[in-house]
Every structure is written in structure tokens, then in C-alpha cells.
């Protein structure tokens, strides 16, 4: 698969275009995956603006991509997403993008990688995890700690089941009872229990609610990682997606153009 950046797309525009929905997968009552046929390049960690005429638009992360398609995990939480949930396979959805920088795959290759993600924050990093699970020669040790509120909120259950045994995958729940598939507690509880090897070369990715990112990064630093080894995903109030409206500005950076993936050596300087 190509790792092209959508920054190179010559037709990059503020005007959305219609694209066909190939399939819809219902992970939970509130979270559905829309696979959409596209003719533009995409990269894990980037995002598109998804819209419907006379309804509005919303920024949605690219959770995975392939030859001529992208996956968008959409949570039904507002006017736009509620309207999207009335669509079916074969219908059109309007997209503009891709936008943002995406994950630094070349920097991550052949190094130990720890991914810590919570809730729908699993979606922006899901495709990257799948790539490394399916291409173990491209990565060192791969550890994944994924947290959800309860069993009913777990995303990508079928795929996660195939990942077990190939790499260290920990699924942890805020609520419920532990069994052979799930542990109980927050992602930081599981991280506290983990012994990290190859600290000097390890890379870490943290995706989720802001408070989760804050405490997870703090723990990683306490465990010996340097800010330069940590990557965070800040998805904040993006509107125009081209750095003009200022809604997503954090200090001197714009999440939509400078991010949403930031090295923590940069992110720690944000004056929010």
C-alpha cells in the first residue's frame, strides 16, 4: 500500500465531492465503520471532512485504507453523524481531504512499538496496528494496550481476535469482570504493570481523550521514554482543515495542518 501524503494531492480543495459507500459495519449501536470508494491517497492518522448536502460536515479520522477505499469509524453523536447513520451501502457521502500529516511509519519501522489507545481513539491507529501485525518483519516488539468502557463498547472484535498470539495485545475495560480476553482497569493501570524493554529505541503512540493522553504520557516519561519517542494524536475542534479559521489552533500550531499527529517534543510546548 502506498504511504503517500494527501498534501501532494493537486486537486486539494475546500469543495467536497461525492463518493460511494462500499459497506457499513456496525461495531456497536453508536459506532459504525463506513468503507468508502475514493480516488485520492490516504495515510493512517490523516482525516477527511465528511458531509451531506444541507446537513453539515464533520472531521473523521481515516482508520484504514487500501487500493481505492478508506475506512471511517463514525460515532453517532450529533446532527451530521446522525444523518450519516441513515445511509446504506451504495449511497453517496461527500468528502474533502485528506488532511493532516499521519503517523511517521518510516520512523517506527524496525523498532519496538507501544500503542496505548482508548475508546474511539483506537480508530485512528487501527490501520497502522493491522499493518504491523500483518507485516511483523517491519516492526520490533509490538505491544498494544486498548481500553474501553465495557464489553459492549469494544471495537474491531473480530480483527482483534486474530491478532492474539501474534503480538502482545491487552484489552482492558473500565467496567465488568475479567476473563481470558479482557482485563479490568484503565489503560494506565495496565501500563503501570508492564515492563518496557529496549527503552532507548522504543517508540510509543498515544491516542484517546485528552485526560488519558496526559496521564499516559506522564507515565511513559516516568518509565524512561524521552519526549522524542512519544507520538500523540490531538483531534481538536477542526473546522476548515486548511489552517485558515483558527478553531483548532494550539499555541502557534494548527492541529489540522501541523497535526493531528504530533511528536511530544513539540506537543509539550503547546500553550493551550
Swiss-Prot record:
NCBIfam families: sulfite_red_B
All residue ranges annotated as the FAD-binding FR-type domain in the record: 14-105
Inducing stimuli: By sulfite. Repressed by oxygen.
Cofactor comment: Binds 1 [2Fe-2S] cluster per subunit.
Binding site for [2Fe-2S] cluster: 240, 245, 248, 256
Pathway: Sulfur metabolism; sulfite reduction
Location (main, coarse): cytoplasm
Pfam families, A to Z: DHODB_Fe-S_bind, NAD_binding_1
Free-text function comment from the UniProt entry: This enzyme catalyzes the hydrogen sulfide production from sulfite. It is strictly anaerobic. It is regulated by electron acceptors rather than by cysteine.
Subunit text: The anaerobic sulfite reductase seems to consist of three subunits.
PROSITE patterns: FAD_FR (PS51384)
Molecular functions (GO terms): 2 iron, 2 sulfur cluster binding; flavin adenine dinucleotide binding; metal ion binding; oxidoreductase activity
GO cellular component annotations of the record: cytoplasm
CDD domains tied to this protein: sulfite_reductase_like
Family matches, as SUPFAM superfamilies: Ferredoxin reductase-like, C-terminal NADP-linked domain, Riboflavin synthase domain-like
Gene this chain is encoded by: asrB
Family recorded in the similarity comment: Belongs to the PyrK family.
Cleaved signal peptide residues: none
Entry binding sites for FAD: 113-129
InterPro entries, per database record: Cyt_c3_hydrogenase_gsu, Dihydroorotate_DH_Fe-S-bd, FAD-bd_FR_type, FNR_nucleotide-bd, OxRdtase_FAD/NAD-bd, PyrK_electron_transfer, Riboflavin_synthase-like_b-brl, Sulphite_reductase_B
Protein name: Anaerobic sulfite reductase subunit B
Organism: Salmonella typhimurium (strain LT2 / SGSC1412 / ATCC 700720)
Source superkingdom: Bacteria
Key words of the record: 2Fe-2S, Cytoplasm, Electron transport, FAD, Flavoprotein, Iron, Iron-sulfur, Metal-binding, NAD, Transport
Any single biological process term in GO: pyrimidine nucleotide biosynthetic process
Subcellular location: Cytoplasm
Amino acid at each position: 500500500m502506498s504511504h503517500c501524503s494527501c498534501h501532494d494531492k493537486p486537486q486539494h480543495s475546500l469543495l467536497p465531492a461525492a463518493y460511494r459507500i462500499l459497506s457499513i459495519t456496525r461495531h456497536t449501536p453508536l459506532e459504525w465503520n463506513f468503507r468508502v470508494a475514493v480516488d485520492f491517497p490516504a495515510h493512517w492518522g490523516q482525516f477527511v471532512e465528511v458531509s451531506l448536502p444541507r446537513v453539515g460536515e464533520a472531521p473523521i479520522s481515516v482508520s484504514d485504507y487500501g487500493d481505492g477505499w478508506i475506512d471511517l469509524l463514525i460515532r453517532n453523536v450529533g446532527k451530521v453523524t446522525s444523518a450519516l447513520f441513515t445511509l446504506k451501502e451504495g449511497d453517496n457521502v461527500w468528502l474533502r481531504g485528506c488532511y493532516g500529516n499521519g503517523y511517521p511509519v518510516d520512523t517506527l519501522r524496525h523498532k519496538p512499538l507501544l500503542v496505548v489507545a482508548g475508546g474511539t481513539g483506537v480508530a485512528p491507529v487501527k490501520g497502522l496496528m493491522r499493518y504491523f501485525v500483518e507485516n511483523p518483519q517491519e516492526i520490533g516488539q509490538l505491544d498494544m494496550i486498548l481500553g474501553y468502557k465495557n464489553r459492549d463498547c469494544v471495537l474491531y472484535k473480530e480483527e482483534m481476535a486474530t491478532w492474539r498470539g501474534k503480538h502482545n495485545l491487552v484489552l482492558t475495560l473500565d467496567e465488568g469482570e475479567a476473563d481470558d480476553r479482557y482485563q479490568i482497569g484503565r489503560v494506565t493501570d495496565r501500563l503501570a504493570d508492564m515492563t518496557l524493554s529496549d527503552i532507548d529505541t522504543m517508540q510509543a503512540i498515544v491516542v484517546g481523550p485528552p485526560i488519558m493522553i496526559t496521564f499516559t504520557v506522564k507515565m511513559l516519561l516516568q518509565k524512561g521514554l524521552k519526549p522524542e519517542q512519544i507520538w500523540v494524536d490531538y483531534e481538536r475542534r477542526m473546522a476548515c482543515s486548511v489552517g485558515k479559521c483558527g478553531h483548532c489552533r494550539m499555541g502557534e500550531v494548527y492541529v489540522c495542518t501541523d497535526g493531528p499527529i504530533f511528536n511530544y517534543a513539540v506537543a509539550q510546548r503547546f500553550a493551550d
